A protein has these predicted regions:
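Helix-loop boundary and gating motifs at the non-cytosolic
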Residues: 2-87, 96, 252-293
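Substrate-agnostic recognition of the 12-TM MFS/MFS-like secondary transporter fold
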Residues: 39-57, 77-93, 109-113, 139-223, ...
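Cytoplasmic membrane-interface "Motif A"-like loop-to-helix N-cap segments
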Residues: 97-112, 173, 311-326
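C-terminal ends and interior cores of transmembrane alpha-helices
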Residues: 108-130, 323-341
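Short hydrophobic/alpha-helical segments at membrane-entry points of transmembrane helices
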Residues: 131-140, 254-256, 343-352
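Flexible cytoplasmic inter-helical loops of multi-pass small-molecule transporters
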Residues: 222-242
Length: 433
């Protein structure tokens, strides 16, 4: 597609006039906005689908169950994914800032993720039991560390190439197209694989995700990025000192990290939705296809709305998402007491869908807020500090499940609702960007 057609498509999608607004990016970068916008959209759509095909919350537990991996290792999937992607970021952000072009710090990690999934696919076909679980967790750890590095670079590249006020729409469009692709994949799983998922299906899902990551890397490599400032390259010790200095002096950064940590209650609650729903309506709830379809529909429904909302006020969006999460959790807590006709697979799927919508809103709002409020020259450090502290919180949050063991699933869900109530109060302290 030539540049004129790209510009027309970009102007139509973003409601941009003849005089393009290029708030917070250079004049040279402004000329490349349409092409870069669509490259990021299609790159993101592929990665969104890949993330759903091999997910610690859906398909990987299925794989572990099929391979006979001990249950204790299954519980380590989400902590390994989150901690692996978040904790190392503070130590590599300075390395990224030492380079004028940051896109390669997304491209190379994406290829590492592709090869990690490729190796995982062959583990699925050739091992089982404890050894399979350990190998997959190891590969997931490598995948997650690469993801963390790419996350830093992505925010920097977006800030350099997409105007402020259009970033939320771009992120939402990625998620929408990815949601459509996910929906198609979920429907196929639900209709074509009725009960047990054989190894060839799981192998195919993992190989497909690997290919999608490789294609996404190729697309991202084509982004036209202007050279950026390279000041600020430091040792990890200096990085820690500077990060701590920012944390101490910037009260808005502290409040944001606290708010983001509390919003983690939304994804943390989702597995307990699955467990409680399965207890109430039977094993049909555990259908991988239903869960994947719910994720796809949620992204299709929520992303366009969330994108425009986040561009208007990502702060208010965080508050709104927390309120939605509270309401949905309270409804789920009441689910066991519903009448026989209401308590079924379809009503549960709807509650799960709302939870996924809320999670999508939480992710988009905090990403947009951080990109918009962080100072340009220190953005990577702000992102790295935020992600590292959230990674530490995730490790702690892995122990929250003891509440469910001691007091039951509904008390566990009420605990998460309390966290979201605190998130609303914390969100009110944030300044507008």
């Amino acid at each position: 597609m030539n540049s004129e057609k790209l510009s027309k498509a970009y102007n139509f999608i973003t409601d941009e006039g003849e005089e393009r607004s290029c708030k917070a990016i250079s004049e040279a970068a402004c000329k490349e906005v349409p092409g870069n916008y669509f490259k990021k959209v299609f790159n993101g759509a592929l990665t969104k689908l890949a993330e759903q095909l091999v997910s610690p919350g859906t398909t990987l537990p299925w794989i572990f169950s099929t391979l006979g991996v001990p249950g204790g290792l299954t519980g380590a999937l989400v902590p390994v994914k989150d901690a692996g992607s978040l904790l190392p970021q503070l130590f590599v952000s300075a390395k990224i800032r030492a380079f004028e072009l940051r896109k390669w710090f997304w491209v190379i990690p994406a290829l590492v993720q592709a090869f990690s999934l490729l190796a995982m696919a062959f583990v699925i076909m050739n091992t089982d039991g404890l050894s399979a679980g350990i190998l997959i967790l190891l590969l997931l750890g490598i995948f997650s560390i690469a993801s963390g590095i790419a996350s830093l670079a992505f925010k920097d590249v977006v800030a350099k190439t997409i105007p402020k006020g259009k970033r939320g729409q771009m992120l939402a469009m990625r998620a929408t197209i990815g949601g459509i692709l996910t929906l198609i994949a979920g429907v196929w799983l639900y209709t074509s694989v009725e009960s047990e998922y054989n190894l060839w299906v799981l192998f195919g899902l993992t190989i497909s995700a690997s290919i999608l990551w490789a294609l996404a890397a190729i697309i991202f490599a084509g982004i036209r990025e202007e050279k950026g400032a390279t000041e600020g390259g430091k040792t990890p010790v200096k990085e820690l000192k500077d990060a701590w200095a920012f944390f101490k002096k910037d009260i808005n950064l502290r409040n944001f990290i606290f708010t983001r940590a509390l919003l983690m209650a939304i994804p943390l609650a989702q597995p307990f939705f699955i467990i409680l729903g399965r207890q109430e309506v039977g094993s049909e709830v555990s259908s991988l296809g239903i869960i994947v379809v719910a994720a796809g529909i949620a992204n299709i429904i929520s992303s366009p709305f969330w994108g425009r909302f986040s561009d208007k006020s990502s702060r208010k969006m965080m508050i709104a998402v927390a309120a939605l999460g509270i309401i949905n959790i309270l409804v789920m807590v009441s689910f066991p007491f519903w009448g026989g006709n209401l308590k079924n697979i379809y009503t549960f799927s709807f509650l799960l869908l709302i939870q996924v919508i809320a999670h999508g809103g939480a992710r988009l709002s905090r990403k947009t807020y951080l990109v918009d409020f962080a100072p340009d020259k220190d953005r990577s450090l702000y992102v790295a500090l935020s992600n590292t502290l959230i990674g530490l919180f995730t490790v702690v949050a892995a122990g929250f499940g003891i509440i469910a063991t001691l007091f039951g699933l509904q008390i566990m869900l009420l605990f998460y609702a309390g966290m979201l109530a605190a998130a609303i109060l914390a969100g009110l302290t944030l300044r507008e960007t």
